[in-house]
From Swiss-Prot:
The active site is at K107 (proton donor). InterPro entries: Aldolase_TIM (IPR013785), OMPdecase (IPR014732), OMPdecase_AS (IPR018089), OMPdeCOase_dom (IPR001754), RibuloseP-bd_barrel (IPR011060). This is Orotidine 5'-phosphate decarboxylase. GO terms for cellular component: cytosol. The gene is pyr-4. The keyword Lyase applies. Its EC number is 4.1.1.23. Belongs to the OMP decarboxylase family. PROSITE patterns: OMPDECASE. It comes from Neurospora crassa (strain ATCC 24698 / 74-OR23-1A / CBS 708.71 / DSM 1257 / FGSC 987). Substrate binds at residues 48, 70-72, 105-114, 347, 366.
Amino acid sequence: MSTSQETQPHWSLKQSFAERVESSTHPLTSYLFRLMEVKQSNLCLSADVEHARDLLALADKVGPSIVVLKTHYDLITGWDYHPHTGTGAKLAALARKHGFLIFEDRKFVDIGSTVQKQYTAGTARIVEWAHITNADIHAGEAMVSAMAQAAQKWRERIPYEVKTSVSVGTPVADQFADEEAEDQVEELRKVVTRETSTTTKDTDGRKSSIVSITTVTQTYEPADSPRLVKTISEDDEMVFPGIEEAPLDRGLLILAQMSSKGCLMDGKYTWECVKAARKNKGFVMGYVAQQNLNGITKEALAPSYEDGESTTEEEAQADNFIHMTPGCKLPPPGEEAPQGDGLGQQYNTPDNLVNIKGTDIAIVGRGIITAADPPAEAERYRRKAWKAYQDRRERLA
C-alpha cells in the first residue's frame, strides 16, 4: 500500500527509540523503547509451540535476544492455569529474568462486556501475566474502551493482596473496600455462615437458645508485604540488569493489517483502527501492521471512505505508536529470501520490514523455532533487525 509517508516520512521514523521515549503517552511503550535500546534488540519471538514445557524452555533459551515474547496460550497443551505457580506465572518470572515483555496474541473481538471478562477473568486471566494483548476491532471502537476500563480497574487493585479470614461477630458493610469485594464476601458468607442452636435450661427451667454467627471478612495488604509467601523459587526471581522491572500497566496492540494472502482487512478497516488508537492513547500502545501508520491520513488509506469524521494534522503528527510486524524470515546465508510458506503466510526480511516499511519490531516464529540452534538463530535475527533499524535512521537522517 503506497502512502505519502514514502516521500515525507513521519518524525518517529527518524528518531531513535531512546528519543521516542519523551513523546510516549503509554508507560509500557516508554519502557519497551528503553528496553530495546538496552538490549539493542527489536525482535519478538512468536513462540507457537505445542506444550507448556517447550514454551518455557524456549523462552528461557531465547529470552536474552528478544524484547517481546508472543504467545497463544490456547494452543498450548499442559498449560497450568494456577495464578501463582502456573505457566503464566513462570513466563512472567522468565520475562523478569531475561528482560522481555509478554504479548498474548488473543485477537479479542466481541462486545465490550464479553471481552472484559475474557481479558481479566476466566481460566487464563490474561491480564495478570501478559503485559500486552491485541484486538481485532471489527466489533467496534467501544470494545477497545471497554478493555481499557477493565485493565485500569485491575491496575488499581493490584497493589494489594486480598486476605480472607473467618471470625465470630456481626458483619459491617463499610469494612469492604468496594462493591466487588462486598459481592465476593457475600458469596462466601452464604457458604460459611451457619446458625447453630444448642438447647439449655435456665435456672428457672425454661429452654433457651444460644445463637452463633460465623462471618467472613476481607482485608487488603500491600503485595510487597514480607508476610506474603513467594510462590516462585528464588532462582526464578532473577531480574534482568540494566533496567528496572516493567511497569504494571497493561497495553493493547490493534490488529490493523495482516500478512496472510487474501486478508479482508481493507483500507477502511485500517483507518478505523487508526482512529481507535488515537482515541485510546492511554491503553493502546500501537499496531500489528504491515506498514508504519504514524501520521497516516484517511486519504492515504481509504480516500473514498465517508466516515463523517476528520483528523487534524496536529493529531496525526502527534502519533508515536509502536509497530510490530509478523512474517519475518531470513534465508540461509547465500540463498534468496523465501516468499511464503505455501499456507498463505507471506514472508519479509528484517530489512524490508524495519528499514523500508518502517515497523519497529520484527516478529519471527518458525525461522527461529525450527532452527537447529534456536538461540544462535535468534541472535542472527536480532543483529539483522537491529541493523535494519540503524539503516533506516541513517537513510532518513
